[in-house]
Amino acid sequence: MTEELCRQLREWAEAYHQADFITNDPVQFPHRYVRQEDIEIIGLLTAVLSFGNRRMILRKVDELDALMGHAPLQYVLSRRWENDFSRENQRSFYRMVSYAAFRTYFEKLYAVYAENRTLEDALLAFQGNPMQKLCAFLGVSDRSPQKKLNMFLRWMIRRDSAVDFGIWRRMSPADLIIPLD
């Protein structure tokens, strides 16, 4: 890595790894919570919806948070999502994601928290690095950049930032990647 690139990366890190960055970023949603399970749930769902216009993302995740009664774990375990996200509902929930398609995230999260205390606990049963574990859990390819999922992993694993949580202690920040396009 060149000196110039190192300098630029440090500059960006200093600019974006500040608490005031949280206010207008999707990471604001998991920052509303203190319980690990709530942070994991809203964090994953926020990351999955983090594509397109930032204002639209913030509006949709705020709507989702309200729908969950600002209690993600309780919402998942209560199975209220079965009514809110019907298998038959092909209408758009957010951009090209239908209600039926988004339901699969709730199904997976329910399975996790019905059997495990945390999502981190569930992921440790899978082989590979954190991205491979998360992709295996979600049933998606780990061969594409998966920028949204890498962002989620960064939030959960990195410990040296006002933005990230560092609540997953059994996975190493050294195993995180930064996808570039």
Region spans (language model):
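HhH-family (HhH-GPD) DNA N-glycosylase catalytic core used in base-excision repair
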Residues: 1-181
